[in-house]
Amino acid sequence: MIAGVDEAGRGAWIGNVVAAAVILPNDYDLPDLTDSKKLSAAKRERLCAAIYEQAIAVACAWCSPEEIDQLNIHYATLCAMKKAVITLKVAPTEVLIDGKFAPELPFPTRTIIGGDALEPAISAASIVAKVTRDKQMIALDALYPDYGFAAHKGYGTQKHQQALRQFGVLPLHRRSYAPIAALLKNNKK
């Protein structure tokens, strides 16, 4: 039972970093399964629903902006990945993680650079993590519509930068990120 693991939201300026772990059955039927970044939002949503229907186990976990600021994004990502794997309802025999780094886990673990496009279980985790984080950003957009989170998902786009200058830094912004830290520093002057 191979668990694929990936994250979403490392580079965003606001919100959680989300990790997902997915164990697929050998006979899964998920056409177009690939790296979430290569799929439209609608296709990701459809595949995510199918992954939840077909997977042996799916788990999502995240670290908050406060945890990101305390640990740094690298360790917060590893922490979210570990939480996702540990909360799977079925123990994996091996864990495949997208990227170069892996958290300490009680299971054999391998990292695969570009694994979200190479390993189906990692692709599935990529989709689940992205859809989960996007939903969090859409919910945040409902609370703070002036920031445009539904469109840019918290990344440092021009619209996000403009909203920050106009409306200020929110409690869920990652204060350790240089652009946010600079705004906070300038606002103290």
Curated annotation (Swiss-Prot):
Places the protein is found: Cytoplasm
Pfam annotation, one family: RNase_HII
Reaction(s) catalysed (UniProt annotation): Endonucleolytic cleavage to 5'-phosphomonoester
One Gene Ontology molecular-function label: RNA-DNA hybrid ribonuclease activity
Keywords: Cytoplasm, Endonuclease, Hydrolase, Manganese, Metal-binding, Nuclease
Gene3D superfamilies named in the record: Ribonuclease H-like superfamily/Ribonuclease H
Cofactor(s) named in the record: Mn(2+); Mg(2+)
PROSITE patterns, sorted: RNASE_H_2 (PS51975)
Domain RNase H type-2: 1-189
Domain of life: Bacteria
Cysteines engaged in disulfide bonds, as pairs: none
One of the protein's GO biological processes: DNA replication, removal of RNA primer
Gene Ontology CC terms, in alphabetical order: cytoplasm; ribonuclease H2 complex
Keyword Metal-binding: yes
Enzyme Commission number(s) from the entry: 3.1.26.4
Residue numbers binding a divalent metal cation: D6, E7, D98
Cofactor note: Manganese or magnesium. Binds 1 divalent metal ion per monomer in the absence of substrate. May bind a second metal ion after substrate binding.
Record-linked NCBIfam families: PRK00015.1-3
Family of this protein: Belongs to the RNase HII family.
Function, in words: Endonuclease that specifically degrades the RNA of RNA-DNA hybrids.
PANTHER family named among the record's database cross-references: RIBONUCLEASE H2 SUBUNIT A (PTHR10954), RIBONUCLEASE HII (PTHR10954:SF18)
UniProt name for this protein: Ribonuclease HII
